[in-house]
Amino acid sequence: MDELAGEFAVGVIEGDIATDLDAAKLGGRGAQISLLNTGNGFGGECHLDAPMVNRALQGLDLARLDLVIIENVGNLVCPAEFDVGEHAKAMVYSVTEGDDKPLKYPVMFRAVDVVLLNKIDLVPYLEVDVDSYVARVREVNPTATILPVSARTGVGMADWFDWLRQFVVGSAT
């Protein structure tokens, strides 16, 4: 968020089953935040849908925003199956999850425009082959942009921010 705050007015719809912990982490970082809890007393929804997002959009001053990021409830199954009105879909896929996830959960991987292959800083300790992760993603989505990143160290994040910049500029035309 800090990287983009000076360039674009950003809004975030933060989807979680319960709590405002993630939204609180983003508070004060230059973005408008709209919290969307799906909890219903029985565990909550495992995804967001368009009506939920529409309600959350009411909490943002859209006329003043260049980009709205929707963080869906986090798993690799449900979110891919529900249209939330997005113009592009990104996902975070961590090297700690194993390279088999694109084959086990192909719907999500087929649906995305960009894959952030996160926790790349752990590769030396996990003894994993990044090329294998990329190849598995390519099996189910040959056109997705794949960006190896480390949110912790910042490695590769410039590429992600460049992707977002190109998206925002391209969407404005």
Description of each model-found segment:
Residues 13, 116, 147:
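Conserved Rossmann-like nucleotide-binding pocket used by diverse enzymes
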Residues 22, 104, 156:
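Short acidic active-site motifs
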Residues 122-173:
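Canonical P-loop GTPase G-domain recognition
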